[in-house]
Amino acid sequence: MSRLFGTDGVRGLANGLLTAELAMQLAQAAAVVLGHERSTNGARPRAVVARDPRASGEFISAAVSAGLSSSGIDVYDAGVLPTPAAAYLVADLHADFGVMISASHNPAPDNGIKFFAKGGQKLPDEVEDAIEAQMAKDPVRPTGSDVGRIQTFSDAEDRYIVHLLGTLPHRLDGLKVVLDCAHGAASGCSPQLFNDAGAEIVVIGAEPDGLNINDGVGSTHLGALQRAVVEHGADLGIAHDGDADRCLAIDHEGNEVDGDQIMAILALALKESGKLKDNVLVATVMSNLGLKIALRNAGISIRETAVGDRYVLEEMRDGGYNLGGEQSGHVIFADHATTGDGLLTGLQLAAQVALTGKSLKELATVMTKLPQLMINVKKVDKARAGTDEGVLAAVAEASAELGETGRVLLRPSGTEALVRVMVEAADMPTAERICKHLAAVVEERLAVAPAV
C-alpha cells in the first residue's frame, strides 16, 4: 500500500481520495498520536483547526472536528485562515497540535489535510507514519465528560494580525500596495494587515466563492496583479497563493520579483541590521546562481537543500539559521514563524521599500538573475541519472564549459518517469544550447526499453 502522506500532508480530489470518512479517520488517528502527551496527564488535549475557503473545506473541517472531539480533543475552530496563521496559533494558544485543510495553489476541486505539532512545527516523517499506522487500529471512544468540545476561535484572525504587525521594522505610510489574495485564505486578513500597517491598498482576488480559488489570480497567475499595479500607479504588488504560505511581488513597472530576489533583499537587510544568523541564507538547489553570487559578494553564504520547504526548514532548525526559502516564494523567517508565511514576507518586503525610500525595482537589482532553462525528459530510467557514465561525462563537460558563469542540475522526478535538466548560463543562447544537448544525451542514454 502506498504512503498516504505526501510531501505536504494528505492531498487529493475532495470526495475522490479525500472523503469525509478519510478525514475523520485521520483526525481520530492524529488524536491518539499527537494528543497522547496531555491525555496521560488527565487533561483534554487541544487542537486548532483552520481551512482555506474551498467549498469542500466545510465538510472536511466538520469531519476533522468530529473525529477529534469524539476522540477526546477540544477543538478550536479558527474558520478560514492562512496556513501560517494556523501554525502560529498552535504555538500562541499552547495547543497540542493543529490541522490545516487546504490544497494550497491547487485548483478548487482538490483539498488537503496537514498537521502541525506542538509549537506549530511541521510533522517529521516518522510521526506521519505513526498516524497512518494508527488508522488501522480502533479509535479511542471516550464518554461523558471526557468527550472533546468544539468552540469557535473568535479572535484567531486578530491574534495573527497583531503578531505580524509586531514584526514590522518600519510602517508603510505613504506606500500604495496592490494585494492579490488568490480568492483564498488571505482574502480577509491580508487587506486588514496592510491597512493597519499604514499602506494605501488596492485589493484584487479577494472574493472567494468556494470555487474560484487560484483561478486566474494569485502567485501562479501574476498577469492580473501586474496590470493592476501599473493601472493604479502602485509602488508594488503582493501575490499570495490559496493558503497564503508563499509570496511573489511585482514592482511599480509590472516586473515580477521572485522568491530568490525577495530573499536577496531581505537577507541583505537582516545582515545590515546585524540580525542574519551566522550570515547564512538557506535555499534549495533550484535557486538561481545569481542569488549565490550576489550574497557571496555581500559576505553571506548559502546552505543548499533539496527542493521543498520542509527540507529548508530542517536545515534551518539543524543549523539554527533564521532565514530561508524557495524561488517559488516560500520564505521562512524563523524569528517570527515556523513555516513559510506569505503575509509576513510581503509585509517585510514592503517595509524595506518604505524604510530605504528605494523602489522595489531598485532593491531587486541587488542580484542579477542568470538565464535559466529547464527541459523535462520523459519516459527514461530516472534511477540511472546519477550513475550512467555517458550522462555523467556530458554533465562534467558542460559544467567545465560554464565554469563559474553557470551551472548544470539533473533532478529525477519524485513522482514521474522523467528527469529534469536545468542549465543556467551567462546568456540564454548558451543555456539553451547546453540544455538541449544534455536533454538529448539523457534521452538516448536512459531510454526505457519498450515492453515486449
From Swiss-Prot:
Active site (catalytic residues): S104 (phosphoserine intermediate)
InterPro entries per UniProt: A-D-PHexomutase_a/b/a-I, A-D-PHexomutase_a/b/a-I/II/III, A-D-PHexomutase_a/b/a-II, A-D-PHexomutase_a/b/a-III, A-D-PHexomutase_C, A-D-PHexomutase_C_sf, A-D-PHexomutase_CS, Alpha-D-phosphohexomutase_SF
MF annotations from Gene Ontology: magnesium ion binding; phosphoglucosamine mutase activity; phosphomannomutase activity
One Pfam family, short name: PGM_PMM_III
Sites bearing Phosphoserine, chain numbering: S104
Highest rank taxon of the organism: Bacteria
Post-translational modification (record): Activated by phosphorylation.
Enzyme class: isomerase
GO cellular component, one term: cytosol
This protein's UniProt keywords: Isomerase, Magnesium, Metal-binding, Phosphoprotein
Family: Belongs to the phosphohexose mutase family.
Name listed for the protein in its UniProt record: Phosphoglucosamine mutase
Organism of derivation: Arthrobacter sp. (strain FB24)
Lineage: Bacteria, Bacillati, Actinomycetota, Actinomycetes, Micrococcales
Gene: glmM
